[in-house]
Amino acid sequence: GSMPFDARLLRRWHLYRFCTNGIAGLWLPHYADLVCMLTGTKYPTRGVAMGGNYVWEDGREHSDTFHTIMEYPEGFLFDFAMSLGNAGGTHFTIHGTNATLDMDKWTITPEGGTKDKPAEPRKIGSEPVATHMANWLQCIRSRQLPVCDIQIGQQQTVAVVISALAHDTGLRHRYEAAGRKVVPG
């Protein structure tokens, strides 16, 4: 149905439930994608989330602070947190059993790893790659699959849905791969 004009929707659409599911849908997919790319995993098995409006009093329908933890079948947790009330920047690290990978500094260090197989500290470089948009447009022309195809998008969506539902209901949610469903539990 129709609704009355609201000028706030022109620039602040992301604050409303009928447009998005908040931080889980706007920011989490980028990091869930990185987790899949770097570890080779596909879908989280279950997750929890919480958050709330602790900073902004502007009529938003979504939390300004969000935290989710998801478990993956390979035996690790993905912990994502974001606060829109702090400009401290992003921090993305992977804490493995032999090393810590700091994606902000592009370094690998033995910090936090085991003593019997410590990683050699080193700086890593990113490989130059085309942007997602350039890759997508090239694939439209060539009829090839893009780097992030629909299957990868679906993997990210499962992480988003688990987290958003867990946040909204206060219940842990899990992914049933056989039926491709996210359910409480």
PLM feature spans:
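NAD(P)-dinucleotide binding in Rossmann-like oxidoreductases
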Residues: 58-60, 64-66, 71-131
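Generic alpha-helical secondary structure signal
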Residues: 8, 128-135
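Non-transmembrane alpha-helical segments in soluble domains
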Residues: 32-36, 69, 133-141, 154-157, ...
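Acidic/polar loop patches that form or flank catalytic/metal-binding clefts of enzymes
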Residues: 41-49, 77-80, 101-104, 145-149, ...
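C-terminal helix-rich "cap/oligomerization" subdomain common to oxidoreductases
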Residues: 58-61, 139-185
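Tryptophan-centric aromatic hotspots in well-structured domains and transmembrane helices
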Residues: 13, 27, 31, 35-37, ...
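Predominantly a Rossmann-like dinucleotide-binding segment in NAD(P)-dependent oxidoreductases
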Residues: 1-48, 53-59, 90-92, 123, ...
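Active-site-proximal structural scaffolding
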Residues: 27-28, 40, 61-63, 87, ...
